[in-house]
């Protein structure tokens, strides 16, 4: 299809943001505006409506949690308007679709679920790529628990570190590999230091090649408090790595025999991680929906159907 990137002001500067959007919408004869910014899609789709763009797609990728009362409250306010300006509703999962667009719309088939697509080939890195990383971080003969994602309230790093602290008493060779950055990074770093876990926890930071880090792990942990889908869960299984998830992760994310869901109970997580046996991961048939080669064709077909 081809694409070009246009820099616009951040939405926090709303008037300037809308002014620039209006300029580009007016200057180009767009048939479709597809917004992926969840409840904030209200703003670009409002301007698309003002500019008489015929097809306006709101795409939701998340559900709210209790991370910040002000932020969560804003999401609930914007949700009221999220069904006003779109002509079409899309979500990454049933859970995300029902939350933003309502049970009635979902049950009547007005919400299209489009999976977050993944390039499967990227998640099978070669030994030449993995061995230097493994050596640099001294991971040979270690039991590596990975957590790949932003350091936010939703991802629940504090819970995982408390679980890991107890896991070390049962598996002395355990290492916690944390990949990512975010607003709580410094707080989590201090939490690790306070628990004297510096020698057992590796903070990798933000990376551009997360696919290489999945295969360094024996298991990936996703103890999320809330999730719209959990791309980390999907990617872990595609990489052939077992993953333990919380009950906040939707069913759609389970695409193999190597995904285990456990309630957010520390003892249960410690027991599972301490007794985990490595197994060969076999993807299920529904994993194909996440393959970018298939999903991209479906998205093109979706657009073409809309502009008929």
Residue spans for each PLM region:
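Aromatic "clamp/platform" in nucleotide-sugar-dependent glycosyltransferases that forms part
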Residues: 206, 225
């Amino acid at each position: 299809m081809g694409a070009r990137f246009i820099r616009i002001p951040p939405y926090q500067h709303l008037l300037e943001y809308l002014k620039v959007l209006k300029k580009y919408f007016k200057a180009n004869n767009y048939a479709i505006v597809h917004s992926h910014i969840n409840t904030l899609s209200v703003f670009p789709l409002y301007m698309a409506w003002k500019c008489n763009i015929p097809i306006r797609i709101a795409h939701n990728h998340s559900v709210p949690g209790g991370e910040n009362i002000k932020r969560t409250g804003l999401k609930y306010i914007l949700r009221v308007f999220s069904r006003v300006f779109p002509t079409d509703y899309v979500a990454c999962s049933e859970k995300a679709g029902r939350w933003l667009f309502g049970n009635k719309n979902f049950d009547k088939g007005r919400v299209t679920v489009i999976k977050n697509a993944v390039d499967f080939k990227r998640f099978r890195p070669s030994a030449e790529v993995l061995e230097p990383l493994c050596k640099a971080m001294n991971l040979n003969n270690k039991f590596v628990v990975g957590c790949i994602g932003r350091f936010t309230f939703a991802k629940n790093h504090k819970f995982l570190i408390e679980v890991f602290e107890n896991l070390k008493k049962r598996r002395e060779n355990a290492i916690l590999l944390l990949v990512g950055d975010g607003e709580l990074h410094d707080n989590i770093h201090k939490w690790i230091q306070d628990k004297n876990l510096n020698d057992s926890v590796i903070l990798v930071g933000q990376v551009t090649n997360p696919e290489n880090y999945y295969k360094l792990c024996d298991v990936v942990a996703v103890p999320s408090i809330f999730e719209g889908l959990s791309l980390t869960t999907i990617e872990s299984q595609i990489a052939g790595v077992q993953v333990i998830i919380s009950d906040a992760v939707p069913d759609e994310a389970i695409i193999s025999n190597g995904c285990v869901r456990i309630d957010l109970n520390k003892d249960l997580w410690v027991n599972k991680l301490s007794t985990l046996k490595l197994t060969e991961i076999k993807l299920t048939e529904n994993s194909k929906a996440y393959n970018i080669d298939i999903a991209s064709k479906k998205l093109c077909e979706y657009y073409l159907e809309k502009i008929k």
